[in-house]
Amino acid sequence: RVCMVEPGVTFGELIPRVRKEGLRLNMPLLPRKTKSVVGSVLEREPVLMPKYQWDISDPLACTEVFFGTGDEFRTGQSAGPGTVKEQWKVGGLQKAPYGPGIASWHRLIQGAQGTMGIVTWASMRCEILPGIEEPFVVESGSLGALLDLTSWLIRLRMVNECFILNDADLAAIFAKKWPEDYGRLKDSLAPWTLFYTVAGYEFRPEERVESHIKDITDLTQRLGLEAARAAGPISANEILKTVQQPSREPYWKLSAKGACQDVFFL
């Protein structure tokens, strides 16, 4: 379950292509329509499905890099033996990120902002497209309570998408008219909202979803929280459909102040 992309390919272009193969991307929250997929994974933008993020470098797999000297270098499984096309002929998929040797050379490239070399293509791991998705939200005035629940959800691997937004960001994402919609939405929301999705796949999807929902209900009750199908006027289904695509224009992070600066605590 891997795809290979060149710089400049956007999430809007790649999402339907992998969907045709029954796959999906582990993508960041509402990237810009013009955002390069390769640029996103090289910058280590936080993804929405921590269940599948085994390492800080995920979902990046392999890369082809040209250094300032003009030397070509391939990281991970793509390093060889043979060219990439020769690897394809024998079933090589450029999925493992480590190597060549025992070193993790891809870590030199990620976060370097082009100072170490120019990436000409990258492969990234994809996930299976679920057959059933049941989204939920949990609102709270306490971030600590939601963090406790999130920790258990991820630890027990029961959810796919899983993230927390404050009222300002959630309102900014769904406000259609500024500033009227933004103020109205923000006032109707709790200070913090946890969103998560329970998914079922090929084998016994309904039973899987029902079982996870029951277990999560036990968790929320133990923590004094309650899962719901909507946060204020925003339904969980609407959130799910929105976050599985790139941001509409104008870019949601620019709506409030006209500019933004992302700071990732990795």
Where would I find each of the regions flagged by the language model?
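FAD-binding subdomain of flavoenzyme oxidoreductases
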Residues: 7, 11-153
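C-terminal substrate-recognition/cap domain of FAD-linked oxidoreductases
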Residues: 137-266
